[in-house]
Amino acid sequence: MKLHFVKNLADRREIMMNYHLLARGIRDPAVLKAMLEVPREAFVAEGMEELAYDDYALPIDEGQTISQPYIVAYMAESLELSAADRVLEIGTGSGYAAAVLSRIVSTVYTVERLAGLARSAHQRLEMLSYGNIHVLEGDGTLGWPEYAPYDAIVVTAGAPDLPKPLLSQLSVGGRLVIPVGATPYLQMLVRVRRVSEEEYRSEELCPVRFVPLIGAAGW
């Protein structure tokens, strides 16, 4: 795999920070720092590097997309992360969001159902020296039970309902951020807190549009 970088992207990165993140309410210093540190141009399709810091989703391999910078930052901030947290991500894609999370928390576990994406994301993250990210090819709706429980779980695809396997893999006090909706392409971003072994509390954050979450506990 060859990684592609574009010189003189610093100005665009600053525009992203000032106009797409700060101006829209992102305030968590750790999230902002991570968004500045991670080179989004290394995670987009070849030939689209100059668009890396524009605030919209871009196509990647396998007919999938890399989320716009604002939604990556918003979801990370909504997880209410601390440096010692262990995070599970469902939907690795090119690995960009996992890379951002890895600059904030101790360890990231990420699951991708598409073999080609899982393989290329693993290679990319390894080449970029993100040593605290672990990639698994598999059905993300089932989580990654081997390393559960997690302090936070983030899902980057829209589910018809809250996947029970993911709820069960949250630690008490843990947060799940996930798009949920009755149609595959229009959802409400929801944050769920596990307040005890048996009790969960959820709140709606904002309307979003994600690709469908495919799997045994998804579409």
Swiss-Prot record:
The keyword S-adenosyl-L-methionine applies. Disulfide bonds: none annotated. Coiled coil: none annotated. The keyword Cytoplasm applies. SUPFAM superfamilies: S-adenosyl-L-methionine-dependent methyltransferases. Transmembrane segments: none annotated. One of its GO terms (biological process) is methylation. One of its GO terms (molecular function) is protein-L-isoaspartate (D-aspartate) O-methyltransferase activity. InterPro entries: PCMT, SAM-dependent_MTases_sf. Keywords: Cytoplasm, Methyltransferase, S-adenosyl-L-methionine, Transferase. It catalyses: [protein]-L-isoaspartate + S-adenosyl-L-methionine = [protein]-L-isoaspartate alpha-methyl ester + S-adenosyl-L-homocysteine. One of its GO terms (cellular component) is cytoplasm. It holds the Pfam family PCMT. Its main location: cytoplasm. The active site is at residue 67. Its EC number is 2.1.1.77. It is found in: Cytoplasm. PANTHER family: PROTEIN-L-ISOASPARTATE O-METHYLTRANSFERASE (PTHR11579), PROTEIN-L-ISOASPARTATE(D-ASPARTATE) O-METHYLTRANSFERASE (PTHR11579:SF0). Belongs to the methyltransferase superfamily. L-isoaspartyl/D-aspartyl protein methyltransferase family. Catalyzes the methyl esterification of L-isoaspartyl residues in peptides and proteins that result from spontaneous decomposition of normal L-aspartyl and L-asparaginyl residues. It plays a role in the repair and/or degradation of damaged proteins. This is Protein-L-isoaspartate O-methyltransferase 1. The lineage of its organism: Bacteria, Pseudomonadati, Thermodesulfobacteriota, Desulfuromonadia, Geobacterales.
